[in-house]
């Protein structure tokens, strides 16, 4: 699975997380929703399908259920905030904060030439 800072859509991140967990172990939407504190077993599935929205308030609990902490959790909440922003000013603020966080934590994988240079 890609690093969270490579995502711009929280729905896509949740879906990729679910598919990765499902591929590696016994995991269900019900278990995922339960871990995140939702009573509806399919709520997060509906979020991924665009039928429901994840509130900014519950974004933290979903992030925790996915094992995100620190800047990763903050980035996830910012993706949700950006999606819910009504005004251009709020959207721009969430976008700029998300970009700054991504830039601060983005890792670059060295290519063969760079690796050979630093050997």
Where are the regions a protein language model picked out?
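DNA major-groove recognition helix of helix-turn-helix
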Residues: 18, 47-48, 58
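Recognition helix of helix-turn-helix/homeodomain-like DNA-binding domains
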Residues: 34-54, 63
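A short, Lys/Arg-rich alpha-helix, primarily the initiator
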Residues: 1-30, 118-119
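Short, solvent-exposed alpha-helical "recognition" segments
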Residues: 51-56, 82-86
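Short amphipathic recognition helices of helix-turn-helix/homeodomain-type DNA-binding modules
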Residues: 3-4, 65-66, 70-111
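Hydrophobic micro-packing sites on short alpha-helices
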Residues: 58-66
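Internal, conserved structured core segments that host functional sites
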Residues: 110-119
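Residues within the helices of the helix-turn-helix
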Residues: 30-31, 60
